[in-house]
Amino acid sequence: MSPCENDTPINWKRNLIVAWLGCFLTGAAFSLVMPFLPLYVEQLGVTGHSALNMWSGIVFSITFLFSAIASPFWGGLADRKGRKIMLLRSALGMGIVMVLMGLAQNIWQFLILRALLGLLGGFVPNANALIATQVPRNKSGWALGTLSTGGVSGALLGPMAGGLLADSYGLRPVFFITASVLILCFFVTLFCIREKFQPVSKKEMLHMREVVTSLKNPKLVLSLFVTTLIIQVATGSIAPILTLYVRELAGNVSNVAFISGMIASVPGVAALLSAPRLGKLGDRIGPEKILITALIFSVLLLIPMSYVQTPLQLGILRFLLGAADGALLPAVQTLLVYNSSNQIAGRIFSYNQSFRDIGNVTGPLMGAAISANYGFRAVFLVTAGVVLFNAVYSWNSLRRRRIPQISN
């Protein structure tokens, strides 16, 4: 038992702050290595333009693929053993893997370690499950929206810090620094997260069929998983072509990398500002209204992105899109809280994470395929169509049910 754990009532607000810090540290740790990932692949012996592109794409995607496979297993274990121990397992496991990545000698070792990183991940979905089971239901939207800003903040600062560290100390030391950040996350979680959890034996665990029957609305929960997948597909589809699209818009300028970095970052800044506020609004008017409105707003912003003429126009639209995106996943997570019990929260949030990871893999592939065949601008129009389908699909699923009465 950690020093923070005793018989006093759990202070969920303090747990939220500590979980936010943990999500921030893991978000930063994951994104620290992203700016130089292709350079590290090249340093490990991969040469040639096409081979470098292929291997960079594979080592990037394989983490999400294995995370999607492993998430349900870890979610089930969290429902049996508790969420805090899963947070500790994830932070420590990822820290050890990061050290090994810094010691990798060839691309195959690095590929296996990237897959292992995905297998051992799961800090964020378990943090979501922990907070969702402790926070009063009528504050779920605000709490989960606030928690989501932790990972976003870390992901925003990580690439900048990673690039500076790589330039100053070289590529391999950044992996060791990243491991140190994750070990720090482990100790913060160990000493400052409190959870009162009664372990459940394997025989007492609900099986998959029982999990489904225990849900208040199984079809709605499945539709929310699909919504999460499509949100990530839409977000990821733009990532592979953004820098090239900015270069096309900017023309012959010397600082295209800086401009691209700014435009890539502004949605995260907007989401950071909007997520807690829209989450709080969702607690008042209903997360389903926030979800549908944000999806429609996203469609209305994606379409003109296909017709912009300057990087500034694209940047403004991306900022507004980020404000809408900041409401989407917290709204989905709040609806999952409303429609499932604490007994299965670990598995529900882990299933949702699996769908999110699948979206992270398929989104960039879709964007790259569309841009290769139809040009950069077509990506935004197709993505708008995908999000519009998501809005109609979500509205159709949500209108068939009423949110249960919420109480403290």
Curated annotation (Swiss-Prot):
UniProt-listed Gene3D superfamilies: MFS general substrate transporter like domains (1.20.1250.20)
GO CC annotations on file: plasma membrane
PROSITE patterns assigned to the protein according to its UniProt record, in alphabetical order: MFS
Compartment(s): Cell inner membrane
Leader peptide range in chain numbering: none
Ranges annotated as spanning the membrane: 16-36, 58-78, 92-112, 115-135, 146-166, 173-193, 224-244, 256-276, 290-310, 319-339, 378-398
InterPro entries according to UniProt: MFS (IPR011701), MFS_dom (IPR020846), MFS_MdtG_subfamily (IPR050497), MFS_trans_sf (IPR036259), Mutidrug-R_MdtG (IPR023692), Tet-R_TetA/multi-R_MdtG-like (IPR001958)
Coiled-coil features, chain-numbered ranges: none
One GO MF term: transmembrane transporter activity
Gene Ontology biological process terms in this record: response to antibiotic
Keyword Membrane: yes
Topology versus the membrane: Multi-pass membrane protein
UniProt keyword terms in alphabetical order: Antibiotic resistance, Cell inner membrane, Cell membrane, Membrane, Transmembrane, Transmembrane helix, Transport
Keyword Cell membrane: yes
CDD domains in the record: MFS_MdtG_MDR_like (cd17391)
HAMAP family assigned: MFS_MdtG
Biological role stated in the UniProt entry: Confers resistance to fosfomycin and deoxycholate.
Family: Belongs to the major facilitator superfamily. DHA1 family. MdtG (TC 2.A.1.2.20) subfamily.
PANTHER family: MULTIDRUG RESISTANCE PROTEIN MDTG
The protein's name: Multidrug resistance protein MdtG
